[in-house]
């Protein structure tokens, strides 16, 4: 297993964490304080109102608005033990379940929105990378997405010994293929966490938060239990102290791997992470052989196109295509992980003439994807020669986190040519001429469009329009207009 380092860069209101494996950036995680929610937090609340007609109750958990608890969300784990199993049971009357003035431990499942308070459940769960802990329950549930009966039985047999009076577990989809040691570390971590929640429950007053969904550094460490973490470098004394306190209490095996970075250069610059992040926002990915990938992210899917680059001649073309496709499989696996691309992914490899080459490329892709922490599924080549695959989506892609829609092209990825905009201006002048009586028109446009209209490049477009309408047209440059932006003003 390759050595892994985590680099944590902390600035006011933003934390960035890079996973570097053998010197190469593999993953980037970003959290901004303004976007942190309360889903997953556990509160010691008090029922303030019971509404039998709505089968719900309002609970004061110490926030500005009272939170909402529906009768269907007051359930026990024994009624639903599989991660994806639908709850099927008869819901009791809310009046039988809670009463006004009752203290109750609840977990937030939906953020407050507008005038509505947060939505709650009494069905407390604590997640880690492989397991979900279910307090006060001895069952072991297995995600239905793990389809192999043999694997389901293996995992269940490994996890059952970890169940005790504290609770049981749900085995998550990502657990497929996990080792006994990975599962043991996950289970021990979750039980230590629950003991802390119980301790706070008895000590803290009503309307208090007794567990908060961890900040990004703690979540990342939680999810990397069992991996070959070599060093965890942190460039903030405050964050270092918080992480050290967390690892000392819940993950003592990681405490001696923490390093406080105090260099003069930013930590992401020293390790080449900053440049790698910028490169990961480009559509084009260059391959060492001279070929390249074009990665296009859309609402429906992600498409990846592979090209050979320079033409090498007919005699070696088939071998060049095959080698380029093999190289591309490794680059694709890396880019999917780095950019955090999920959902449907369509790959257009360069056309190959033999089934042997196609099968070897497909196997190379599967081998490269096997190192991904996210679940992937490769469906093979379609009749059109495209490879269909899926990758589990758990968070926004790097592009969606860091970028916004272009205000000029509105997400098209293209802007109209200067010539096209000039003809639009001419049509607008003629339209306005028929609507209003005017002696003169003034066109305000971007520098490139203004220059095209004024100079001879436009092949006399402006004089022709002036002759057509019998009016004078002036052109003025607006430095801050984008290429498609213009105004036609009547004088």
Curated annotation (Swiss-Prot):
Binds 1 Mg(2+) ion per subunit. GO terms for biological process: cell division; rRNA processing; tRNA processing. One of its GO terms (molecular function) is metal ion binding. Its EC number is 3.1.26.-. Its main location: cytoplasm. Keywords: Cell cycle, Cell division, Cytoplasm, Endonuclease, Hydrolase, Magnesium, Metal-binding, Nuclease, RNA-binding, rRNA processing, rRNA-binding, tRNA processing, tRNA-binding. It is found in: Cytoplasm. It is an enzyme of class 3 (hydrolase). The keyword Disulfide bond does not apply. GO terms for cellular component: cytoplasm. Residues 40-129 form the S1 motif domain. It comes from the Bacteria. Mg(2+) binds at residues 305, 348. CDD domains: S1_RNase_E. Pfam families: RNase_E_G, RNase_E_G_Thio, S1. Its cofactor is Mg(2+). Belongs to the RNase E/G family. RNase G subfamily. An endonuclease that acts in the processing of the 5'-end of 16S rRNA and 23S rRNA. It prefers 5'-monophosphorylated substrates and cleaves single-stranded sites rich in A and U residues; contributes to tRNA processing and mRNA turnover. Homodimer, in equilibrium with possible higher multimers. This is Ribonuclease G. It comes from Haemophilus influenzae (strain ATCC 51907 / DSM 11121 / KW20 / Rd). The lineage of its organism: Bacteria, Pseudomonadati, Pseudomonadota, Gammaproteobacteria, Pasteurellales.
């Amino acid at each position: 297993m390759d050595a892994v380092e985590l680099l944590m860069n902390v600035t006011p209101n933003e934390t960035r964490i890079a996973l570097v494996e053998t010197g190469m950036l593999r993953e980037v995680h970003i959290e901004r304080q303004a976007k942190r929610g309360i889903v997953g937090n556990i509160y010691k609340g008090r029922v303030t109102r019971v509404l039998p007609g709505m089968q719900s109750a309002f609970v004061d958990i110490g926030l500005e608005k009272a939170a909402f608890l529906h009768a269907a969300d007051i359930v026990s784990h024994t009624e639903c033990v599989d991660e994806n199993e639908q709850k099927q049971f008869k819901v009791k009357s809310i009046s039988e379940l809670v009463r006004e003035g009752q203290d109750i431990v609840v977990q937030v499942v939906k953020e407050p929105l507008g005038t509505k308070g947060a939505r709650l459940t009494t069905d407390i769960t604590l997640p880690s990378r492989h397991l979900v802990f279910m307090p006060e329950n001895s069952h072991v549930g297995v995600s239905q997405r793990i389809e192999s009966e043999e694997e389901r039985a293996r995992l269940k047999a490994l996890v059952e010994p970890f169940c005790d009076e504290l609770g049981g577990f749900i085995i998550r989809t990502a657990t497929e293929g996990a080792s006994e040691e990975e599962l043991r570390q996950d289970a021990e971590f979750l039980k230590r966490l629950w003991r802390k929640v119980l301790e706070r429950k008895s000590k803290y007053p009503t309307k208090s938060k007794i567990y908060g969904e961890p900040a990004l550094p703690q979540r990342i460490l939680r999810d990397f239990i069992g991996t070959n973490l070599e060093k965890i470098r942190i460039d903030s004394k405050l964050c270092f102290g918080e992480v050290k306190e967390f690892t000392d209490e819940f993950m003592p095996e990681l405490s001696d791997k923490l390093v406080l970075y105090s260099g003069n250069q930013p930590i992401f610059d020293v390790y080449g992470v900053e440049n790698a992040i910028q490169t990961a926002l480009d559509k084009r990915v260059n391959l060492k052989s001279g070929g390249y990938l074009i990665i296009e992210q859309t609402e429906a899917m992600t498409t990846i196109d592979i090209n050979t680059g320079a033409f090498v001649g007919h005699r070696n073309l088939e071998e060049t295509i095959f080698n380029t496709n093999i190289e591309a499989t490794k680059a694709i696996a890396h880019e999917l992980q780095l950019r955090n691309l999920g959902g449907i992914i369509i790959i257009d490899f360069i056309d190959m003439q033999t089934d042997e080459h196609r099968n070897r490329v497909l196997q190379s892709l599967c081998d490269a994807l096997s190192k991904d922490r996210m679940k992937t599924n490769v469906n093979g080549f379609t009749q059109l020669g495209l490879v269909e695959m899926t990758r589990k989506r758990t968070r926004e892609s790097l592009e969606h986190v860091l970028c916004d829609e272009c205000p000029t092209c509105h997400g098209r990825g293209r802007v109209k040519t200067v010539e096209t905009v000039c003809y639009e201006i001419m049509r607008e002048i003629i339209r306005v001429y028929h609507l209003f009586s005017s002696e003169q028109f003034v066109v305000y446009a971007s520098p490139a469009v203004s220059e095209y209209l004024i100079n001879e490049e436009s092949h006399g477009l402006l004089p022709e329009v002036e002759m057509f309408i019998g009016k004078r047209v002036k052109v003025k440059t607006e430095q801050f207009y984008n290429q498609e932006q213009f105004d036609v003003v009547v004088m």
